[in-house]
Swiss-Prot record:
Cofactor(s) this protein cannot do without: Mg(2+); K(+)
Cellular component aspect of the GO annotation: cytoplasm
Name of the protein this chain belongs to: S-adenosylmethionine synthase
Binding-site residues, K(+): 43
Biological processes, Gene Ontology terms: one-carbon metabolic process; S-adenosylmethionine biosynthetic process
Source organism: Desulforamulus reducens (strain ATCC BAA-1160 / DSM 100696 / MI-1) (Desulfotomaculum reducens)
Function text: Catalyzes the formation of S-adenosylmethionine (AdoMet) from methionine and ATP. The overall synthetic reaction is composed of two sequential steps, AdoMet formation and the subsequent tripolyphosphate hydrolysis which occurs prior to release of AdoMet from the enzyme.
Length: 397
């Protein structure tokens, strides 16, 4: 079999782009908790001592945005001014407008209802909030049906945050990144080739101490022992020093970690980010639906790997296209799988929102460590409740 390497990365909740994502989703959750029908497109920019929140929000409630921002920053761990970013003292600026009425009229009443193609009741008067394509993916490499490299990178990033917050490693600061290179024998993971951990730290801690702790208390604590061998490389803070970090070291923006948020590069991406967007935005809801579909296809045994593409036009409820690729692993043809998908999944925005119960404040928890394959969270798009029906209708035992 051919041997090949594949690499994926993750970042901790203290990474500046993830700080921005979490602020945007914390604001979204705070609004949805009071007004589930709100329209939210919330973008965040963070830099040294400053948070700027902008976007378009239409809702029937009041949310204290600066308070939400500060609470989120403090929860992440930026609690002292010497970190260059502190939730108590940073400036918070807001520039919020209402959703464009031109967009709203397309979302509020879908094209099919206007032209009589279907009843307004059937589509719940919701058209897609924008055009675009979204991808979902699943593979049988891991129990959560995610690619192994991104799964391991997220697991290490969560562990890195855990040892900081619990004091197991008391010199760490919030910013950090992980990266895992997995060697494949054909399509099966065979070993871990390279592990990279970069973590912000107290200025007086030496690199050898950091290296020892990161290998023993982070990497080897969570990586599968059977995949680590004497040739596995561990690269810890390769530059030698990582004291200045977080928004003080790099500006952060909502939506700049879309590959970390999804499949670590193992599948294609439509380009749309998730955080700060209410579920009428198909960038988010349809990407969740595509994952839900792909995961159920793999869980049903219809394929070992499955990538689903959905595409939408603004103001139109039904997807303009549904595409499936199983990379030669299908137990049935891709055409049969598409037919099963069309019969078992309602992929109109209203149908997605209803079936996955997306008008709830459930988004902040997804804004770090990935939106998919999260055994630590109860996410509706990770459910495999359609697998039995798909398997039965496909005629598989």
């Amino acid at each position: 079999m051919s041997r090949k390497l594949f690499t994926s990365e993750s970042v901790t909740e203290g990474h500046p782009d993830k700080v921005a994502d979490q602020i945007s989703d914390a604001i979204l959750d705070s609004i949805l908790a009071k007004d589930p029908m709100a329209r939210v497109a919330c973008e965040t920019f963070v830099t040294t001592g400053l948070v700027l929140v902008g976007g378009e929000i239409s809702c029937q409630c009041y949310v204290d945005i600066p308070k939400v921002v500060r609470e989120t920053i403090l929860e992440i761990g930026y609690t002292r001014a010497k970190y260059g970013f502190d939730g108590d003292t940073c400036a918070v600026l807001t520039a919020i407008d209402e959703q464009s009425p031109d967009i709203a009229m397309g979302v509020d009443k879908a094209l099919e209802a206007k032209t009589g193609e279907t009843t307004e009741a059937e589509i719940e008067a919701i058209g897609a909030g924008d055009q675009g394509m979204m991808f979902g993916y699943a593979t049988d490499e891991t129990p959560e049906l995610m690619p192994l490299p991104i799964s391991l990178a997220h697991t290490m990033a969560r562990r890195l945050s855990e040892v900081r917050k619990t004091g197991i490693v008391d010199y760490l600061r919030p910013d950090g990144k992980t990266q895992v290179t997995v060697e494949y024998d054909g399509d099966k993971p065979s070993r871990i080739d390279t592990v990279v951990i970069s973590t912000q730290h107290h200025p007086e801690v030496d690199l050898e101490t950091i290296r020892k702790d990161m290998i023993e208390k982070v990497a080897l604590h969570v990586l599968p022992a059977e995949l680590v061998d004497d040739k596995t490389r561990f690269l810890i803070n390769p530059t030698g020093r990582f004291v200045i970090g977080g928004p003080h070291g790099d500006a952060g923006l909502t939506g700049r970690k879309i590959i970390v948020d999804t499949y670590g590069g193992s599948a294609r991406h439509g380009g749309g980010a998730f955080s700060g967007k209410d579920p009428t935005k198909v960038d988010r809801s349809a990407a969740y639906a595509a994952r839900y579909v792909a995961k159920n296809v793999v869980a049903a045994g219809l394929a070992k790997r499955c990538e689903v593409q959905l595409a939408y036009a603004i103001g139109v409820a039904h997807p303009v296209s549904v595409r499936v690729q199983t990379f030669g692993t299908g137990a049935v043809s891709d055409e049969v799988i598409i037919d099963l998908i069309n019969r078992h999944f309602d992929l109109r925005p209203a149908g997605i929102i209803k079936s996955l119960e997306l008008r709830r404040p459930i988004y902040k928890q997804t804004a770090a460590y990935g939106h998919f394959g999260r055994p630590d969270l109860d996410l509706p798009w990770e459910c495999t409740d359609k697998a039995d029906a798909l398997r039965a209708e496909a005629g598989l035992k």
